[in-house]
UniProtKB/Swiss-Prot annotation:
Positions with a binding annotation for Mg(2+) 2: E268, N270
Enzyme class, broadest EC rank: ligase
Reactions catalysed: 2 D-alanine + ATP = D-alanyl-D-alanine + ADP + phosphate + H(+)
The protein's name in its UniProt record: D-alanine--D-alanine ligase
Disulfide bond entries: none
Sites where the protein binds Mg(2+) 1: D255, E268
Pfam families (alphabetical): Dala_Dala_lig_C, Dala_Dala_lig_N
EC number: 6.3.2.4
Pathway: Cell wall biogenesis; peptidoglycan biosynthesis
Keyword Manganese: yes
Chain residues that bind ATP: 130-185
Single Gene Ontology MF annotation: ATP binding
Amino acid sequence: MSNATKFGKVAVLLGGKSAERAVSLDSGQAVLDALLRSGVQAEAFDPQNRSVTELVNYDRAFIVLHGRGGEDGQIQGVLEWLNIPYTGTGVQGSAIGMDKVKTKQIWQGSDLPTAPYRIITKETDLDSVIAELGLPVIIKPVHEGSSVGMSKVEKAEDFAAAIEKATQHDAVVMAEKWITGREFTISFLNGQPLPVIRLQPPADVAFYDYEAKYQRNDVEYGIPCGLSETEEKKLQALCLRAFQAVGAEGWGRIDAMQDEQGNFWLLEVNTVPGMTSHSLVPKAAKAVGYSFDELCVAILDQTLEGTA
C-alpha cells in the first residue's frame, strides 16, 4: 500500500492487565499482522510489560486493549497527555462506555430504550429486585466486557451464587431484566452503522457469553440479519443515536435485542470490540466489501483526521 507511510510509526496496543487480556492479545496480533501486510510500520506494544511513557516514540496508536485500562479512558488519557493520535473513542466516551450503568443512564435520559435494571449492593433486597424485574434476569459486573462474570438467573435460589460470581470481577454489580427474543449486534466504522448481524448461539448456551464469543464454532451469525429493510434501518438509526449519545467515535459496536412484540432494546456499547477470527466488526465490514486488512487501515485512518 503506497500511502501507508503517512501513518508513520504505529503502536498496536494489546494485552494489558484486564480480564480480557487473552482476547486482546489475539485481537492485537491480528491487527498488527494486517497493518504489516498493508505496509504500515507497526509494532506490538503491551502496557503490562512496558512503560506507557515509551509511547512517545510512536506517531500514533491503534488501541486493541479490551476491558479496564484500555477501554475505560485510562490509556486514552495517557495518549492525550502525550499528544499521540489514537483510534476509536476519546477519554470521556470510553469511560462512559465501560460503565454499563452510566451508559444506561445516558440512554434513558436520551429517551432511548434499554432493558430495566437494578444496581445490586450488599443491602439490596433480592426479593424486591425479582418483584421489579421478574425472572429470569441477567447478572453483570458493571465494568467488564466480553460477558466476563455474567450469569442468567432463572430461579430465586440461584441469585446469590450469580452475584458472588460477578463480584469476583467487579465491586459494582447489576441485575438486568432478561429480554426474550432475537439478539443483534450493530458495528460502526467511521461513525456510521454497518449491516446488522443476528446472533444465534447454540441451544445449550443461555446467552452470547465469553465461550460463545471466542471459543465455540457453532454460533450462527446472520448476515443478512432477517429483519425487513425498514426494521434494519430503524435499528441502525436507533443504535447510531445510542452510539453518539455516550460519546463513542470512529469504530465500535452496540448489542441490542428485539423482544417478542417486535420492540428493540439496547443492551450495551463496546468501544474497542474484538478483532479475532470470531469477531463481529470484521464480519459486518466484510458484508460491505472490506477485507480484514482494509478494515484495519480504515480504522487507523481516523487518527489522521485534523492532521492533514
